[in-house]
A protein has these predicted regions:
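Active-site Asp-x-Gly
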Residues: 414-470
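Conserved alpha/beta core of the MobA/IspD/sugar-nucleotide pyrophosphorylase nucleotidyltransferase superfamily
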Residues: 3, 167-249, 255-256
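Active-site acidic catalytic loop and adjacent metal/ATP-binding pocket
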Residues: 253, 387-436
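ATP-binding glycine-rich loop module of kinase domains
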Residues: 245-274, 293-308
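Conserved core of the sugar-phosphate nucleotidyltransferase
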Residues: 110-195
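Conserved kinase catalytic-core helix
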Residues: 150-151, 278-283, 303-402, 491-492
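Helix-rich C-terminal or lid/interface subdomains of diverse kinases
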Residues: 228, 316, 354-364, 441-442, ...
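Conserved N-terminal catalytic core of the sugar/cofactor nucleotidyltransferase
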Residues: 2-5, 13, 27, 31-103
Length: 544
């Protein structure tokens, strides 16, 4: 017996969630949807996976996550446009499914599945769930005609295409057991040749042909449909297996048993990350494997550095990385470094802020109060960044060996050392180096704006005609830790804390396009503009 999962479709109902990857790779909690499916089945069951839209992402992930599983991959040449359909996609796997098998949609999650449907069977069945939604196809069943074994199944009476009422019926959830596989494939071929079936819906096959005389219905007690935006949101809300991270649609972090698997949609990113990693691996968790779009390392039992953080440990962390050479100066062409620095701080930030202003139709053409601080209209973000680059600290910036997300949320403490988890592929066009001041700016950002507060909506933003009020909940250690960071950068590197604070503001401004339609977006913008203004005024006073 085999398990057949089709992942070839484009997932159009999921909009931007499938812009950069396959719908089976959408993350719910710690895992992508396809892992929730596979993990519900016995480890010795052979998998047949159809691949199409971003199929290479699915294959790379499964090879890393399940290296010991027997998996047959079936590439579907036409998964979008004329001639494509679920029927066509399934037919591509026919030669690999010449025995009884279970078919499972790649957007259907059922918990405790082995307790509800048979893994070994001698009849054909459809799996359904009681719901009032009219979005789904359904089938009627004879409640008085049921088996007496562990898995109660009922005589299936009739199928319906999206009926007006589901009273007394079960919604088809995209799981079925095919025992009479020869008859199944015969009917699939008939359906494919029938013009009425040139649609994406394989349920039409069951609806038209009724498939088998002994087709039975099995009812499950839970079901999550991740094939639409509302279903994904509900699944993420209910998921108990979760961790704090602000997700991006083109990147992902998965935890699969004893592995951490990171995903990067853009080709070339992983190659650059590996090149950078080879220079700074003493500070990182060792990479165990990687592919074109994924890298993998072992999950270790260590505290996230932000847990139980306190001023003593914070200062210890800063000194640990200083003493071990994380911020040692590197020899690099100064002209190249300065060009990359300008593009990173100026071009990138202005591009991000322009995206934000265009999206929200916001102009900087009048005075504004943020938290009752007057910011004159002359102090646009573009103007303030221009003034920032005239600072002696900007001009004297030294190239160092690390570039990444130097924040407590992306750092582990194993009792002996601190481990960095999130290094970046490059500092503009420089792969192996970065700007130490950016690291301090990111850490300063994290002390105020941490994942826990952001993910749990522990922030406020109130907009009035000429005044905006913003705040975010911070832990009680933050004020003292910021003072420690201030002393650290001023004492060890002779850098103004206001300069670091300005970089923090740049970080916030640059994050805004990542969270359009999320209240975090405006919070970051107004926090960033206020911090830019206050830091710039203080820097000017220092230099006068």
């Amino acid at each position: 017996m085999k398990l057949f999962i089709t992942t070839s479709g484009i997932g159009s109902r999921l909009l931007d969630l499938t812009k950069y990857t396959n719908k089976s790779m959408i993350k719910i909690g710690k895992k992508p949807v396809i892992s929730y499916i596979i993990d519900e089945y016995p480890e010795d069951i052979e998998l047949v996976i159809s691949l199409g839209y971003y199929g290479d992402h699915v294959k790379q992930y499964l090879d890393l996550a399940y290296p010991n599983r027997k998996i047959t991959y079936v590439w579907v040449d036409n998964y979008d446009g004329p001639g494509s359909s679920q029927v066509y996609s399934q037919l591509q796997a026919e030669q690999y499914l010449q025995e009884p098998f279970i078919y499972h949609d790649c957007d259907t999650i059922v918990e405790n599945l082995q307790d509800q449907i048979p893994m070994d069977f001698d009849y054909n069945f459809l799996v359904g769930y009681e719901t009032n939604s009219e979005l789904y196809d359904a089938f009627d069943y004879d409640i008085n005609n049921k088996t007496k074994d562990k898995f109660e199944s009922y005589k299936l009476i009739k199928t319906y295409m999206k009926p007006d009422s589901l009273v007394g019926m079960l919604s088809f959830i995209g799981i079925c057991g095919i025992y009479d596989y020869k008859t199944f494939w015969e009917n699939m071929h008939k359906a494919y040749e029938d013009e009425r079936f040139k649609t994406p819906y394989d349920f039409l096959v069951y609806h038209e042909y009724q498939m088998f005389d002994d087709l039975r219905a099995i009812k499950v007690n839970n079901w999550t449909d991740t094939g639409n935006i509302a279903g994904v949101k509900e699944a993420r809300k209910k998921c108990k297996d979760n961790f704090f991270i602000l997700d991006k649609i083109d990147q992902g972090i998965f935890i699969i048993k004893d592995k951490v698997i990171k995903f990067f949609a853009k080709d070339g990113v992983v190659d650059n990350l590996i090149t950078h990693y080879n220079k700074i691996n003493q500070f990182c968790q060792p990479i165990t494997n990687y592919t074109k779009n994924f890298l993998c390392y072992d999950f270790i039992d260590a505290d996230n550095a932000i847990n139980n953080m306190n001023p003593v440990r914070f200062e210890k962390m800063l000194n640990y990385f200083k003493d071990n050479g994380l911020w040692e100066s590197q020899n690099v062409d100064n002209n190249l470094f300065n060009k990359c620095k300008d593009k990173f701080y100026i071009n990138k930030t202005l591009d991000r802020v322009n995206q934000f202003k265009e999206f929200y139709n916001i102009n900087e053409d009048k005075d504004i109060y943020i938290n009752d601080v007057l910011i004159p209209k002359e102090y646009t973000i573009e103007y303030m960044i221009s003034e920032f680059t005239k600072s002696k600290y900007y001009k004297e910036t030294k190239c160092t060996g690390w570039h990444g997300d130097f924040v407590l949320d992306n750092m582990l403490w194993d009792g002996n050392k601190f481990i960095l988890l999130d290094w970046r592929e490059k500092f503009d066009n420089i792969i192996e180096y970065g700007d130490m001041n950016y690291d301090f700016g990111k850490m300063n950002h994290n002390l105020t704006f941490n994942f826990s507060s952001a993910c749990n909506d522990l922030f406020t933003i109130k907009e009035y005609e000429d005044n905006v009020y913003v705040s975010i909940l911070a832990d009680n250690y933050v004020y003292e830790c910021r003072n420690i960071l201030k002393r650290f950068v001023e004492t060890n590197y002779n850098i103004s804390y206001d300069y670091i604070n300005f970089i923090t503001a740049i970080c916030w401004i640059s994050m805004t396009p990542l969270y359009f339609l999320n209240p975090l977006c405006k919070l970051l913008f107004y926090m960033g503009k206020l911090t830019m203004y206050q830091s710039l005024i203080n820097m000017k006073k220092e230099e006068d």
